[in-house]
Amino acid sequence: MNVLQILPELKSGGVERGTVDLAKYLKKKGHKAVVVSAGGALVGELTSAGVTHYALPVHRKSIFSVIHSVRALCRIVQLESIDVIHARSRIPALIAFFASRRTQVPFVTTCHGFYSRHLLSHVMGWGKLVIVASHIIGKRMRDDFGVPFKRIRLIPRGVNLDEFKLRPREAQGKTVDVIVGMIGRLTPIKGYPLFLKAMARVARVMPNIKIQIIGDAPKAPYKEELEMLARNLGLSDAVQFLGTRYDIPELLSNFSVLAAPSVGEEAFGRVVIEAGACGVPVVATRMGGLVDIIDHEKDGLLVPPDDPRILAEAILTLLKEPATAQKYAASLRKKVEREFDLPRMFEKTLQVYEEAVSQKRILVIKLSALETSF
């Protein structure tokens, strides 16, 4: 099968990483993989793996740029004999939709998160099939954009178990610190103030606790606000803001507990399955896609999104009861192996491609039969 994925850019990020990994997997399995984007740091990794990349300004919203990109994409689709087009963002999806109409090549979309009820957002539901990363996204696509469930396919994000793997902390030859951490962009929805307020309570019970916050800040003032809050809570000596890091598996493996205290609806919660793969116990809020991953008191602990006291108590439970923490971590690891293994997600995606192509074949057969009858 010849597959073309289209997305705005190939810089670092979860969507970009998933695109590259899927393209490499398709290539390895004997399929043709083509990626169209405006370029970025990950292009070299693609081309080194034998994946064809075309640079187009598919991140620009200008109507003239969109028209140019539609024409160029049609030429690429024909040149590469593409069987299915897979769009992963709104402007690329708009371009892919018109190219699909002109070339009669099926087009599918992946909804990685929530979209505002903007007119442009409707395009994410125009795919012949619509892939969603969690049940809550699927529900939103139905309720907000009228996408029928019969066209929605649930494929959660996967995790590379060769990269995120069990690493016994004692075997790393380092002093074992008690570390509670968060990983994710420094944005209000992630619940960083809630986390810091909870950790101030934890620190009163465990004064030597260490806190690590890993992630970049799209808006610098917000990071400064969090640093000020940490100082006001008396956590300056305990907390580290580590920024963007590329050694996440190693850092995550050193955590005693991962906190995922989102205060808004998370589309999925990739860091939770990464923690599960590493055998790290998890405390998360009962929000959005997080409940698709964690079964309370089986795979981890779920808490309300508005109470630092309850969050602190949950973290302390896992720190003070290592047997319980390990039981939850082992259960989550098994779930990740069973439901979120990256190759399994890729195979499910390939099945969606095959379904989209087969629907086109059925339509062609029906039209041919109709023409014959006249």
Where are each of the predicted segments found?
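A conserved mid-protein helix/loop that constitutes part of the nucleotide-sugar donor-binding site
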Residues: 13-21, 182-204, 221-224, 309-310, ...
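Short hydrophobic beta-strand element within catalytic cores of glycosyltransferases
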Residues: 35, 281-284, 294
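Glycosyltransferase donor-sugar binding loop
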Residues: 35-41, 183, 210-224
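Acidic anion/phosphate-binding donor-loop and adjacent secondary structure
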Residues: 61-65, 139-144, 150-151, 158-175, ...
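A conserved, positively charged/aromatic
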Residues: 101-135, 139, 146-147
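Active-site donor-binding acidic/aromatic loop of nucleotide-activated sugar
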Residues: 219-225, 236-245, 251, 301-302
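Acidic donor-binding loop of glycosyltransferase active sites
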Residues: 238, 253-267, 280
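Conserved acidic donor-binding segment of nucleotide-sugar-dependent glycosyltransferases
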Residues: 296-297, 301-308, 317-323
